Amino acid sequence: MRAPPGPAPAPPQGVALGRWAEPEPERYRALFRRVGAPWLWFSRLILDDADLAAILSDRGTEVYSVTRDGAEIGLAELDFRQEGACELTFLGLVPEATGGGIGRWLLAEVATLAWTRPISRFHVHTCTLDSPRALPAYRRAGFVPVRQEVEIAPDPRVTGALPADAAPQIPQL
């Protein structure tokens, strides 16, 4: 995305986005796991506390929690560490919060936040292990695919980063 999107819609009733100044690694991991386990998100789970804390407390990293009626239901992480750019590192909702328009609002809201900084590019990496609704949502929001890569990693259910019963819709190799 090379230009700011239009204004974000109003948040759904009872839903809010708040910045975590410096989330504790274990609290962050707990929400990351709730959001990402259905899609085998594991990258933050395998970092030790010191490495994760270094990322989360970096001045170029912004972490946001999505709440509904005070309960955490999602997260967003923006990475401004590359000058002039922002990467949407993570964005997601817990399974029970999907399908009601919160994700569309969240994506628009974080895009607006990203463009408050002096950037000329806002980008996201997604993968086949993400929700099948992710790529269409990113395209609707104004992101344009620029390349495709193949990444291979050990299955986090085998390594123990996630429970063996996580993401049953994804074949275990």
Predicted features and spans:
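Conserved GNAT acetyl-CoA-binding A-motif
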Residues: 114-126
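Conserved beta-strand-loop-alpha-helix junction that forms the acyl-donor binding cleft
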Residues: 98, 124-134, 151-157
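A conserved beta-strand-loop-helix scaffold within acyl/acetyltransferase catalytic domains
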Residues: 43-50, 56-95
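Terminal substrate-recognition subdomain of acyl/acetyltransferases
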Residues: 1-14, 144-173
